[in-house]
Amino acid sequence: MQGRLSAWLAKHRLVHRSLGFDYQGIETLQIKPEDWHSIAVILYVYGYNYLRSQCAYDVAPGGLLASVYHLTRIQYGVDQPEEVCIKVFAPRRNPRIPSVFWIWKSADFQERESYDMLGISYDNHPRLKRILMPESWIGWPLRKDYIAPNFYEIQDAH
């Protein structure tokens, strides 16, 4: 079953794949990394001007990494928001996805956290660096193949 946004994207020949609907009836779409930036701009102009959240996860050990965007469009009133979930999958070896910081400023810390925990590089992000882990940390702690170090250095908070 194709949702309203998926039908609109198909009508305008914008490449995507419908992944169905979640339990709340929110449409989920898959976008290729190379198409993500242009489609993100189109979605913003179309009215999806609120990035509710961005997160990332490791699909499977040795598999793809996913960056997930929850977008909201309020056209008919705040009590009737139109929402969509966008998933962008990237290869584990060199996970690169265009940053949407310049479209939705709220992506700033969220993309940095995804970089810090999973190692996804968000191209053209102005401050892409670790946000939770120390700069000297080696590895990506939320990857399923991450091996935790045997010790942790306690640092003075002063």
Swiss-Prot record:
Pfam families associated with the record: Complex1_30kDa
Quaternary structure note: NDH is composed of at least 16 different subunits, 5 of which are encoded in the nucleus.
EC number: 7.1.1.-
Family: Belongs to the complex I 30 kDa subunit family.
Protein's name in the database: NAD(P)H-quinone oxidoreductase subunit J, chloroplastic
Catalytic activity: a plastoquinone + NADH + (n+1) H(+)(in) = a plastoquinol + NAD(+) + n H(+)(out); a plastoquinone + NADPH + (n+1) H(+)(in) = a plastoquinol + NADP(+) + n H(+)(out)
Enzyme class (EC, first level): translocase
Cellular localisation: Plastid, Chloroplast thylakoid membrane
Subcellular location, principal: plastid
Gene Ontology CC annotations of this record: chloroplast thylakoid membrane
Protein purpose: NDH shuttles electrons from NAD(P)H:plastoquinone, via FMN and iron-sulfur (Fe-S) centers, to quinones in the photosynthetic chain and possibly in a chloroplast respiratory chain. The immediate electron acceptor for the enzyme in this species is believed to be plastoquinone. Couples the redox reaction to proton translocation, and thus conserves the redox energy in a proton gradient.
GO MF annotation: an example: quinone binding
UniProt-listed HAMAP family: NDH1_NuoC
Topology of the protein relative to the lipid bilayer: Peripheral membrane protein
Keywords, sorted A to Z: Chloroplast, Membrane, NAD, NADP, Plastid, Plastoquinone, Quinone, Thylakoid, Translocase, Transport
InterPro entries, A to Z: NADH_DH_suC, NADH_quin_OxRdtase_su_C/D-like, NADH_UbQ_OxRdtase_30kDa_su, NADH_UbQ_OxRdtase_CS
GO process annotations (BP): photosynthesis, light reaction
